[in-house]
């Protein structure tokens, strides 16, 4: 279950899906593909407790959630994209797209390397282990799933958002 509130989605502009839009239960802007997953990360501090999740834009259902673990928001965004790609491959899903609001994470996925500066400590060991696994997955698998930029300024917060921001923009 995913909780959506007026801060999560830009509710000033859209309250419900338009009557013509029968491809989603979410109030998505017309230009957003509903046959998609949205990923996002949340982190309290930098570094700090980090978690990430994925939401199906057709149903609003949470596809996965991981964390919290000690890390950074950028690491969480990267791991969320790779987790979604791996799960799509595992389930044979080839017709969806992935939305992410993180330019850094999308670039890291494209380059198959997470360029984090997170210090290696016992507290951050799990995050570094997951990053290594994700990088290995990217190097050993090919994927054709489009990873699209979620336009937060235009569309409001991504539906996978954790809703913790107080007026900040990515």
Regions found by a protein language model. Give the residues of each.
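Acidic, His- and aromatic-enriched active-site or binding-groove loops in soluble protein domains
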Residues: 168-170
């Amino acid at each position: 279950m995913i909780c959506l509130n007026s801060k999560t989605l830009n509710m000033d502009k859209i309250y419900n899906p338009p009557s013509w839009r029968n491809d989603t239960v979410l109030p998505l802007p017309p230009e957003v593909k509903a046959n998609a997953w949205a990923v996002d990360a949340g982190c309290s501090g930098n570094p700090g407790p980090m978690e990430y999740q994925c939401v199906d834009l057709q149903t609003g259902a949470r596809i996965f959630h991981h964390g919290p673990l000690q890390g950074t928001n950028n690491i969480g965004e990267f791991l969320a994209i790779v987790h979604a790609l791996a799960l799509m491959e595992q389930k044979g899903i080839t017709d969806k797209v992935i939305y992410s609001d993180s330019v850094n994470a999308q670039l890291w996925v494209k380059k198959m390397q997470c360029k984090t500066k997170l210090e290696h400590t016992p507290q951050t060991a799990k995050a570094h282990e997951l990053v290594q696994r994700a990088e290995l997955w990217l190097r050993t698998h090919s994927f054709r799933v489009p990873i699209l930029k979620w336009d937060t300024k235009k569309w409001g917060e991504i539906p996978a958002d954790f809703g913790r921001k107080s007026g900040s923009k990515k």
